[in-house]
Amino acid sequence: MDLTTEAEAFGAEIAFSDEAVPAVVGHCLSNADDIDKLVVPSLSQGRIPAYLKANLLAARSITDRPVFAGCIGPYSLAGRLYDMSELMVLIYENPDAAHQLLSKCTMFIKKYCQALRQTGVGGVMMAEPAAGLLSDGDCKTFSSDYVRYIVDEVQSDDFLVILHNCGNTGHCTKAMVSTGAAAYHFGNKCQMEEVIRDIPPTALAMGNIDPVSVFKDGTPALMRQTVFNLLDKMKDYPNFVLSSGCDTPPHTPSANVDAFFEALDDYNQQ
């Protein structure tokens, strides 16, 4: 996922590369005064219109499987605007300023998700990896409460919010669940058979094949064994959905991706 699109709309400088996903250069906010002056941008800024058009075209042309959009979460966006290390300090030294920034980020993400819903996609995967740096209590206060607001505003029977937090090692799952999202997506650093115990049976738990050591650097044989091992552990949970633990990196061999789906099909036919 491109987690710079929303930051660019706020005015952040973005570096592009043929070998990696776009990245924010520096940070566009330095203090509480900058936060106070920060204007929530319109959806005409940066690459937002291009992404909305892409989602519209995908929803119209892909009809044999669900189509989901992507967006960043409020805490992760705030970190890209203010600098992640500085934000970790701000939430303790000046929580009011942090909440002001998070509120502005949330307002923009809500507008963006509402526009994504209008394209006809079936939902949005909200990437909030930076919230995994926080304790469960801080995650709820500075991330999940804001995500909950967005979920309440945009989620419906035909538009699901999937909350992704690959920074969660199992320590902030309860905070994630407090958002009320329809599905929760986990990274490879947690144990799926443990975190799913905190997930309501009415919500999906998704994950968590290692995107680097298995998808990119592994072999089809390793992929097959890893998928079978995970599915064995999760066989008693009908709300589990097999997935990668995060974005698959550039240059991931297509043979490994094919092996992922083939292993799933073969396991289900046993």
Go through each PLM region and give its residues:
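A contiguous, low-structure linker/loop signature
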Residues: 2-44, 57, 64-65
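Active-site loop segments of alpha/beta catalytic cores
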Residues: 21-24, 42-270
